[in-house]
């Protein structure tokens, strides 16, 4: 208890001039100059009565609000009013609501006296910062309003806009909006109202500039004036969109101004779900009727609701402050330097207030600005207004998709639209009998069918007509546009349905729907088909040089194999190692013929009966087999492509190749999107291509796709066009092909005038057609009727005789050669047989032929020669006996027994000649027979005992018997002395 008493004494002596708070007094400055009033006075009374009837803050203190009228926005008058307020000992000052300059003066004086100031109107621009004190504002900050307008523009995809300002400070007030346009490099034109306040000249300028989005930064009365003048100029149609920054948008009287399709947007802060809102509106309505019986009540003004919330905010802060300390009021004067000691504490509690009022959630940040609130976005109509979205103070926007814009079926139902188009296969074409038809029936194509689907879906009618100048649309130096774009800008058409490319430059002046087809720029060129596969096309996988080197490799391998086999001792072998009576005679299987045949068998992957024995010959065989493996695999891999693909001869393969040469001309459609793409491109290759196309004479630009196709087929010309058209014309003409890939990615859309009310309806309908697969069905209908198949749809086909007929020719030639050789061998053999048998050649040939054509006989007996001379075996044996050994080889001796007398080694004798006749010359040595060391010893013994018969000859009968044929393909057929 002593402590509490001491505290009260300290407070009493510390504030001797403060009076104990018996009533909570506030001062409200009203600047309402309207006839019927905005209801601010009534709102203050309602707030006072509601608070006094529910709570007492502080204990036994009632709320009192002193009202002061401000006749005009004057600094002197405002200062005089404040000098009247200060001696009354108020805890807060409210208002004014519509005089920013006066509100700034009030804030300055309250800051000097440390009395909280509650603002209920727009901020002054620029916003003054006070070092000692600050006020709090229930009105949205300029930054929030600017951000809300900017987000709405982005939500509706408005590329350009015009700003009408009532005061010069609007650029500072809407600083965030202006900064957004500067960053996006979009167009924002600013127009200032003059002192006459007549917006007609400004509206005419906006109409001439083809700007459809208009932002009005003014109070409610001036905004109403601008809209009324706009209605007189016919600028309130569906083409124009208005955004008002005033927060009194709900009370604007727009009867007779807005149309059914008008788009006028504004903001509202009212919390219609507040429990006291119906009573508040009813009370204001009754007051309005008492003061203004002749006019209709428009609704509650925002300033009245802000005054109501301001009283509650101050009471809430005082109640919280009173819990920690007792509050006392102090009369002040303008001429003194005294301050209210509790003002700073109350200001701190004001910043901490959290209250749900008629204007929504009330909270403040450290700067005293309102935060954590919402702005309802309303759209005006004849029936009133409807909410289409909400903007939150955390800089987010939520649009209501169900109420955004007008219902589709109600917008286009039973309306007739003028549709401009351009002839372009297969999008829009004339029917073959179009002269006998009229209206829309004259045309057909993909776009015509799509337009018919849209009309059935949205229930509208249309009238097709061709664009007057036959162009898609490009900007002129004077700023105007040609083609379909120009007709949309000048309102000559409602829609443009064709192969209409969506570009950023066109989007600035017209609107587009969502793309109904995605594509890119491609290169179309005429190709010369390569020669068709001939009878000898199986030789195409390898060049002639490769075939020549393969032949040389074959000959080289054969020679190396022959030499290696002759030099290596491991290739000489005994053909009969198991017969002990046989002599040690070594044979070599690699004769010259076998050496040539062995690589052929390996190359043909068939092998042969000849197997290498020595390491050297195996090495040669291995590398040859590896060589043939790679060659055959490569040949097989390339053969199918060379026999099935008819190669095309294309001199360039990409846009870079096209830009690097000058032999082939290239160009685009004049005044089309492709031309604009190259004109605006910053890529070096495309810039070079544009410089070439622009400077080339005669011009490389064409007026239509058909002209470009004809130029491609008749000259060295590459046509740059959209990939979908490229695909269509390649299906019609097989001599056309696409070079490289796509140069960009874009889409075709339906064009509309800027701000057209049909944009969203048509976009949604296109999306619905895509989801139902109707657009894909239409594309297949008009693209799959060509004579040439799609390149990616090639399938394997059976090879004809024109592909592989040459191998049959080779086979037939080989068979003919084989038969010819067989006939020659047959003739040669029968001729020799006839001489040995001493019969006529014809008789011998007839007998051999009879045996050869006998299908059942597979063997025959060898005929013996007639008697009368020594047998061939005896002659051979005699020749062997007369052979001598020289350098490890067997040679036949000469007449005098000297081998050297006959000019060196000769071959073995085949026939000793007639009986009693002279001996023939000594033959050359048998190069494939080698005599071992044992034979050398026998030869020496035979030379020492010349008269003794050699061991192993047997009886004379055996000596005279015909020799046995030796097995083996290369073994010698002659008998040696051992046999």
Curated annotation (Swiss-Prot):
Protein name: Glutamate receptor ionotropic, kainate 5
GO cellular component, one term: postsynaptic density membrane
Disulfide bonds: 36-292, 83-334, 165-170
Domain of life of the organism encoding this protein: Eukaryota
Ranges facing Cytoplasmic side: 566-622, 825-979
GO terms for biological process, alphabetical: cellular response to glucose stimulus; chemical synaptic transmission; establishment of localization in cell; excitatory postsynaptic potential; modulation of chemical synaptic transmission; positive regulation of neuron apoptotic process; protein retention in ER lumen; receptor clustering
Annotated Gly residues bias: 894-903
SUPFAM superfamilies the UniProt entry points to: Periplasmic binding protein-like I, Periplasmic binding protein-like II
Family (UniProt): Belongs to the glutamate-gated ion channel (TC 1.A.10.1) family. GRIK5 subfamily.
Its job: Ionotropic glutamate receptor that functions as a cation-permeable ligand-gated ion channel, gated by L-glutamate and the glutamatergic agonist kainic acid. Cannot form functional channels on its own and produces channel activity only in heteromeric assembly with GRIK1, GRIK2 and GRIK3 subunits.
UniProt biased composition (Basic residues): 856-867
Record's signal peptide: 1-14
Tissue: High expression in the cerebral cortex, pyriform cortex, caudate-putamen, hippocampal complex, medial habenulata and granule cell layer of the cerebellum. Weak expression in globus pallidus, thalamus, colliculi and the reticular thalamic nucleus. Expressed at high levels in the trigeminal ganglion neurons.
Transmembrane segments: 545-565, 623-643, 804-824
Alphabetical list of InterPro entries matching this protein: ANF_lig-bd_rcpt, Glu/Gly-bd, Iono_Glu_rcpt_met, Ionotropic_Glu_rcpt, Iontro_rcpt_C, Peripla_BP_I
Pro residues: compositionally biased ranges: 912-923
Keyword set, alphabetical order: Cell membrane, Cell projection, Disulfide bond, Glycoprotein, Ion channel, Ion transport, Ligand-gated ion channel, Membrane, Postsynaptic cell membrane, Receptor, Signal, Synapse, Transmembrane, Transmembrane helix, Transport
């Amino acid at each position: 208890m002593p402590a509490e008493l001491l505290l009260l004494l300290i407070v009493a002596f510390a504030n001797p001039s403060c009076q104990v708070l018996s009533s909570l007094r506030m001062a409200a400055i009203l600047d309402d100059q309207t006839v019927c009033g905005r209801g601010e006075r009534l709102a203050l009374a309602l707030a006072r009565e509601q608070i006094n009837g529910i709570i007492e803050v502080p204990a036994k203190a009632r709320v009192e609000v002193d009202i002061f009228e401000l006749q005009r926005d004057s600094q002197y008058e405002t200062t005089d009013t404040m000098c009247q307020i200060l001696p009354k000992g108020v805890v807060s000052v409210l208002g004014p609501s519509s005089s920013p300059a006066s509100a700034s003066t009030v804030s300055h004086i309250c800051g000097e006296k440390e009395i909280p100031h509650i603002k209920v109107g727009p901020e002054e621009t620029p916003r003054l910062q006070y070092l000692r004190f600050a006020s709090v504002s229930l009105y949205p900050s300029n930054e929030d309003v600017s951000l809300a307008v900017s987000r709405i523009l982005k939500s509706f995809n408005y590329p350009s806009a015009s700003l009408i300002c009532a005061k010069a400070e609007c650029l500072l007030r809407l600083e965030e909006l202006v900064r957004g346009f500067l960053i996006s490099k979009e167009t924002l034109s600013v127009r200032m109202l003059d002192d006459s306040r007549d917006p007609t000249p400004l509206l005419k300028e906006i109409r001439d500039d083809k700007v459809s989005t208009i932002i009005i930064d003014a109070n409610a009365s001036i905004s109403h004036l601008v809209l009324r003048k706009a209605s007189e100029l016919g600028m309130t149609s569906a083409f124009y969109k208005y955004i008002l920054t005033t927060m009194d948008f709900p009370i604007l009287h727009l009867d007779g101004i807005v149309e059914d399709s008008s788009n006028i947007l504004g903001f509202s802060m009212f919390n219609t779900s507040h429990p006291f809102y119906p009573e508040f509106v009813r009370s204001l309505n009754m007051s309005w009727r008492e003061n203004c019986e002749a006019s209709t009540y428009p609704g509650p003004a925002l300033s009245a609701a802000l005054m109501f919330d301001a009283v509650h905010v101050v009471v809430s802060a005082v109640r919280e402050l009173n819990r920690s300390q007792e509050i006392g009021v102090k009369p002040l004067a303008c001429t003194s330097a005294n301050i209210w000691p509790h003002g700073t504490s109350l200001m701190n509690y004001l910043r901490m207030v959290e209250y749900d009022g008629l204007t929504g959630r009330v909270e403040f940040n450290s700067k005293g600005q309102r935060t954590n609130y919402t702005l309802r976005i309303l759209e005006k109509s004849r029936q009133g207004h409807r909410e289409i979205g909400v903007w939150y103070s955390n800089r987010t926007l939520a649009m209501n998709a169900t109420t955004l814009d007008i219902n589709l079926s109600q917008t286009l139902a039973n309306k007739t639209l003028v549709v401009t188009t351009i002839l372009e296969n297969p999008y829009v074409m004339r029917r073959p009998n179009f002269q006998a038809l009229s209206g829309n029936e004259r045309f057909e194509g993909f776009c015509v069918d799509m337009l018919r689907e849209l009309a059935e879906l949205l229930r509208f009618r249309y009238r097709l007509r061709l664009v007057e100048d036959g162009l898609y649309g490009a900007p002129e130096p004077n700023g105007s546009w040609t083609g379909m774009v120009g007709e949309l800008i000048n309102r000559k058409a409602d829609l443009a349905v064709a192969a209409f490319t969506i570009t950023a430059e066109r989007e600035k002046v017209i609107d587009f729907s969502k793309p109904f087809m995605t594509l890119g720029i491609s290169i179309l060129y005429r190709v010369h088909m390569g020669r068709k596969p001939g009878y000898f096309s199986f030789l195409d996988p390898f060049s002639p040089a490769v075939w020549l080197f393969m032949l040389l490799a074959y000959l080289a391998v054969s020679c190396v194999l022959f030499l290696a086999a002759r030099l290596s001792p491991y290739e000489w072998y005994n053909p009969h190692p198991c017969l002990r009576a046989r002599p040690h005679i070594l044979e070599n299987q690699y004769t010259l013929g076998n050496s040539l045949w062995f690589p052929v068998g390996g190359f043909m992957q068939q092998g042969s009966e000849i197997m290498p024995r020595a390491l050297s010959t195996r090495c040669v065989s291995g590398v040859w087999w590896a060589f043939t493996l790679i060659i055959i695999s490569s040949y097989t891999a390339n053969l199918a492509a060379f026999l099935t693909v008819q190669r095309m001869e294309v001199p360039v393969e990409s846009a870079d190749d096209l830009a690097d040469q000058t032999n082939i001309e290239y160009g685009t459609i004049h005044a089309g999107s492709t031309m604009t793409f190259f004109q605006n491109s910053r890529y070096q290759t495309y810039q070079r291509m544009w410089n070439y196309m622009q400077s080339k004479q005669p011009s490389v630009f064409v007026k239509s796709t058909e002209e470009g196709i004809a130029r491609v087929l008749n000259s060295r010309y590459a046509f740059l066009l959209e990939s979908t058209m490229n695909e269509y014309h390649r299906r019609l003409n097989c001599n056309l092909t696409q070079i490289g890939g796509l140069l960009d990615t874009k889409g075709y859309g339906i064009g509309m005038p800027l701000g057209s009310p049909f944009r969203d309806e048509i976009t949604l309908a296109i999306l619905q057609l895509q989801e139902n697969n109707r657009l894909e069905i239409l594309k297949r209908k008009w693209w799959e009727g060509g004579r040439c198949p799609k390149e990616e749809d090639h399938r394997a086909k059976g090879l004809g005789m024109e592909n592989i007929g040459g191998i049959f020719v080779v086979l037939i030639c080989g068979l003919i050669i084989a038969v010819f050789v067989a006939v020659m061998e047959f003739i040669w053999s029968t001729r020799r047989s006839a001489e040995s048998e001493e019969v006529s050649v014809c008789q011998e040939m007839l007998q051999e032929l009879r045996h050869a054509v006998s299908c059942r006989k597979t063997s025959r007996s060898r005929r013996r020669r007639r008697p009368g001379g020594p047998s061939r075996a005896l002659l051979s044996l005699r020749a062997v006996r007369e052979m001598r050994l020289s350098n490890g080889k067997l040679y036949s001796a000469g007449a005098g027994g000297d081998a050297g007398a006959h000019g060196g080694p000769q071959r073995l004798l085949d026939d000793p000649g007639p009986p009693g006749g002279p001996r023939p010359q000594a033959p050359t040595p048998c190069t494939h027979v080698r005599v071992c060391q044992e034979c050398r010893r026998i030869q020496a013994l035979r030379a020492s005992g010349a008269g003794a018969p050699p061991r192993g000859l047997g009886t004379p009968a055996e000596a005279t018997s015909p020799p046995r044929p030796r097995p083996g393909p290369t073994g010698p057929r002659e008998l040696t002395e051992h046999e």
